[in-house]
């Protein structure tokens, strides 16, 4: 868990569909603070396009160009109130853990959560990554005792691929028509420049009538 001053974080943009709050009497009475998790604040999420993704260990397949909805559920198990102020995240290398793409931090609320209160909201994420495997690492910004905390949750292994191209897609059909028209125009231009003169029939010279012999015969008869 990381602590940041509020002035060091720029929360920009909105990427949410719904924001709802509800009371949840179920608390973690056996919570014991640790160095990794000093506060009793639970963060879970679901990728709406892949139900039960939080509980599953399966690889989630995503396609470039699609938009996914990540619905977060944050429960405050602390005796003091906390405020949810933002959400971010990243796509990391699953082997090295190094960040490959950061998600722009987006503001939430701020919404004050009393003890045992739950806050739920949905974040929209457009997929535009190099086709390979990633770890989706969510990050929630919570304000507690004038300190900004960066809370994490379960990391999700995903694989990203490019969309399959079909020749019957409207864009492909239009491109095919343009290529055919261009090819037809090129053939016509070549024919008009070179082919017309090549296929044209050669002109034949007119035949001369033989008049000399007939005149000679007529002269002989007259004698």
Swiss-Prot record:
Organism whose genome encodes this protein: Komagataella phaffii (strain GS115 / ATCC 20864)
Function in brief: Is probably involved in a pathway contributing to genomic integrity.
Pfam families tied to this protein: TRAP_alpha (PF03896)
Protein name per the record: Increased recombination centers protein 22
Region (Disordered): 204-223
Lumenal topological segments: 24-171
Gene Ontology cellular-component terms listed: endoplasmic reticulum membrane
Keyword vocabulary terms for this entry: Endoplasmic reticulum, Membrane, Signal, Transmembrane, Transmembrane helix
Side of membrane Cytoplasmic, spans: 193-223
Transmembrane domains' residue ranges: 172-192
Bilayer topology: Single-pass type I membrane protein
Signal peptide bounds: 1-23
Top-level taxon: Eukaryota
Major localization listed first in the record, in broad terms: endoplasmic reticulum
The UniProt record lists the keyword Transmembrane helix: yes
Localization annotation: Endoplasmic reticulum membrane
The keyword Lipoprotein is annotated on this UniProt entry: no
Family recorded in the similarity comment: Belongs to the IRC22 family.
